[in-house]
């Protein structure tokens, strides 16, 4: 199988307590090099399906080499990436962790942080989907390279899924201080911060709650840090009647006339009971 994982009671306990879990083995390692090749082609503007992704934040020759590169909804452009992010195992696992009846993909990310690639601001994923009812999310984060503290791996604020939902970050890409918005929240609300870096091998996985604060620092290593991410919402989630904050300005265009459904042509249903 391409993807395989088994969630036990300890995983569920850890997720509910901390807002995230990490597992060392998730995706069959034979796929990693091919996925890296596909990612390189995407950023060169070569799309297997002929369809551009919804967001394409870095282009060769146009943008600085030392920023973190991002593509959103690469599943529309590449069939191998679609096979990963639309895998039923992801939907079932996130549903178990969140207590949902099922899950659908709201958006994927391909993130490529090159050597000296800059940081990504601490944020909560759910803050970007006020255009979805209910405003909740859960995320599957799959590294294609070994994740170490020095290569700018993902960091979680432990137990922060129990805090308030804050507005989206104003300075997500390459901020001067990637912890500023989190630090501001901590000071105002008198919270104590404990962070946990995701240190797992290539082909492992982390799952996190949409309320969990997370971000990543500069890649201080001399190797690339590439990740594929699947963001999911409950299977029965709908469009909010009017909200368009966060990523809504991009994704409300997929709202059908006279309907509030998240249509599976644009927001694939991954799994349901």
Q: What are these language model-derived features?
A:
Residues 2-17, 24-122, 128-131, 243, ...:
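Non-heme Fe(II)-dependent double-stranded beta-helix
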Residues 45, 50-57, 166-171, 205-207, ...:
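Non-heme Fe(II)/2-oxoglutarate
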Residues 54, 124-125, 179-193, 224, ...:
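Short, surface-exposed loop/helix-turn segments at secondary-structure junctions
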Residues 107-109, 124-126, 142-146, 158:
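Short, structured patches in soluble enzyme cores that scaffold and shape functional sites
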Residues 114, 148, 163, 234-236:
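Feature marks short, surface-exposed loop/turn motifs that line or immediately flank catalytic pockets
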Residues 125-137, 193-194, 200, 223-224:
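A short beta-loop-beta micro-motif enriched in histidine and acidic residues
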Residues 131-149, 199-200, 207, 231-234:
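Short, conserved beta-strand element in jelly-roll/cupin
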Residues 147-213:
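Double-stranded beta-helix
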């Amino acid at each position: 199988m391409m993807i395989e994982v088994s969630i036990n009671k300890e995983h569920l306990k850890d997720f509910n307590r901390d807002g995230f879990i990490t597992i060392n083995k998730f995706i069959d390692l034979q796929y990693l090099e091919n996925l890296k090749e596909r990612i390189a082609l995407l950023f060169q503007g070569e799309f297997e399906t002929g369809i551009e992704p919804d967001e394409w934040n870095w282009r060769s020759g146009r943008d600085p080499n030392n920023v973190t590169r991002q593509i959103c909804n690469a599943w529309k452009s590449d069939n191998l990436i679609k096979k990963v992010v639309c895998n039923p195992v992801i939907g079932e696992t996130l549903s178990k962790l969140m207590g949902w009846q099922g899950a659908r993909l709201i958006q994927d990310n391909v993130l490529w942080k090159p050597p000296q690639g800059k940081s990504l601001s601490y944020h909560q994923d759910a803050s970007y989907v006020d255009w979805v009812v209910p405003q909740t999310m859960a995320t599957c984060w799959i590294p294609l390279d070994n994740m170490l503290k020095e290569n700018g791996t993902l960091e979680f604020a432990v137990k922060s899924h129990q805090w308030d939902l804050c507005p989206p970050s104003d300075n997500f890409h390459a901020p001067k201080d990637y912890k500023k918005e989190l630090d501001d929240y901590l000071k105002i609300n008198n919270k104590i911060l404990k962070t946990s870096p995701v240190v797992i091998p290539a082909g492992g996985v982390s799952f996190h709650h949409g309320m969990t604060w997370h971000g990543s620092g500069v890649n201080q290593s001399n190797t690339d840090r590439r990740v594929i991410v699947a963001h999911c919402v409950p299977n029965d989630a709908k469009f909010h009647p009017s909200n368009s904050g966060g990523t809504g300005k991009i994704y409300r265009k997929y709202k059908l006339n006279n309907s509030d459904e998240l249509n599976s042509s644009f927001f694939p249903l991954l799994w349901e009971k």
